[in-house]
C-alpha cells in the first residue's frame, strides 16, 4: 500500500546495446479501492524537470521515451498491466537514471527482477 514502482527511474527509448534497447510501453492502471489514485512521472532528461500525470482506476498511458517511475497514494494499492513493444528483436535492457542508479544496490530483489527481462 502506497509507494513507488519503476524505481530506480529507468528508460528504454534508444537502441544502443549493450546499455539499452528501444521498447515503447503501454500501462493500464487499477486501484484498490477503486477511488484510489496515483501519479506517472515522465522525465525526458536526467537533472531536468519533467511531466506528471494523475492516474485513476482504468487510466491508460503510452510512453515512448523518458524515465518513468510511478507512485500510488498511501493507503491504496495500485496494480498495472504493461505491454512492451520492442522496436528491435532483442529482450528488454533498461537504462537506469544516472542520478538514482546507486539505488540498485539498496533495493532488495531489484537485480533479480532486472535479470528476468533478459
Residue ranges, per PLM feature:
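Active-site region of the double-stranded beta-helix
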Residues: 1-57, 72-118
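Histidine-centered metal-chelating micro-motifs
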Residues: 60-61, 65-70
Amino acid at each position: 500500500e502506497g509507494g513507488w514502482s519503476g524505481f530506480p527511474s529507468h528508460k528504454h527509448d534508444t537502441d544502443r546495446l549493450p546499455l539499452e534497447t528501444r521498447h515503447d510501453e503501454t500501462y493500464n492502471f487499477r486501484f484498490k479501492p477503486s477511488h484510489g489514485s496515483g501519479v506517472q512521472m515522465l522525465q525526458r532528461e536526467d537533472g531536468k524537470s519533467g511531466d506528471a500525470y494523475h492516474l485513476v482506476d482504468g487510466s491508460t498511458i503510452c510512453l515512448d521515451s523518458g524515465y518513468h517511475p510511478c507512485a500510488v497514494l498511501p493507503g491504496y494499492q495500485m496494480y498495472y498491466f504493461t505491454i512492451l513493444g520492442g522496436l528491435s528483436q532483442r529482450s528488454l535492457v533498461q537504462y537506469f537514471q544516472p542520478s538514482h542508479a546507486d539505488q540498485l544496490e539498496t533495493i532488495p530483489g531489484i537485480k533479480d527482477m532486472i535479470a528476468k527481462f533478459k
